C-alpha cells in the first residue's frame, strides 16, 4: 500500500518498472542506488512532461534530505546541479529545438529553486541561472509566444518573491524589461497584455493580489 501511495504521490507510474524501482529506492535508501542515473532520469522526464516537472522539485528535495540523513553525502544534489548546469548552457539550443521542452526546463529550474534549501535559504548557485531564464522569457520574440508568457507568469507567481529577496536589483531590471514589452512592443496578443499587466500589478502589490483583482483577471482569461 505504501508503495502505491508513494508511486501516485510522486507521479512515477508512467516509468517502466526498472526506473520506478530506481526512483522508489532513491526516495527511501538513496545510498543503495546510482544517484547520478536517478538525477538524469528526473531531469529527462521533466524536460518532456510539464506535469512531472512540477512534481520533480519535491522529489529531488526528498532524495537530498534522505541521503543527507542516512549517509551524510550530497551525491544526488551534486549530480542534479551538474546536469542542470549542462541544460542551462544549452538552453538557447533547447528553445530553438522545442518551445515545449524549453518551458518545461524553466519550470523545473524554478521548481528546484523553490524546494531546495541550504540552511533554510534558497540555493545561491541557482539564483542567477533562474534569473537568466526569466530574462530570456521577456525578450521581444518570447513575448510573442503565449506558451512562454504563460511560463513567465507562472514562475514569477511561484518564485518571484523569493528571487527578489535574493537579488532585488535583477528583479527591478527584469520588470523594467517586462514593462517596456507591455507598453512599447507591438503585436502582443490581448491575453499576453492581460497577463503582463496582472504580473506588474501583482509585484507592485507586494507579490499578492486582492480577491477583486483575481476575479477580474481570471474571468478575463477564461473569456
Curated annotation (Swiss-Prot):
Gene3D superfamilies xref list: 1.25.40.180
Record-level GO cellular component terms: cytoplasm; cytosol; histone mRNA stem-loop binding complex; nucleus
GO BP terms in the entry: cap-dependent translational initiation; regulation of translational initiation
Record SUPFAM superfamilies: ARM repeat
Signal peptide feature range: none
InterPro entries: ARM-type_fold, MIF4G-like_typ-3, mRNA_TranslReg/HistoneTransl
Pfam families in alphabetical order: MIF4G
Compartments, record wording: Cytoplasm; Nucleus
Chain ranges of the MIF4G domain: 9-206
Keyword Protease set for record: no
GO molecular function, one term: translation activator activity
Keyword Nucleus listed: yes
Subcellular location, principal: cytoplasm
Functional description taken from the UniProt entry: Functions in replication-dependent translation of histone mRNAs which differ from other eukaryotic mRNAs in that they do not end with a poly-A tail but a stem-loop. May participate in circularizing those mRNAs specifically enhancing their translation.
Family assignment from sequence similarity: Belongs to the MIF4GD family.
Subunit composition and interactions: Interacts with eif4g1, eif4g2 and slbp; probably tethered by SLBP to the 3'-end of mRNAs ending with the histone stem-loop, it also interacts with eif4g1 which is bound to their 5'-end.
Name the UniProt record assigns to this protein: MIF4G domain-containing protein B
Protein species of origin: Xenopus laevis (African clawed frog)
Gene assigned in the entry: mif4gd-b
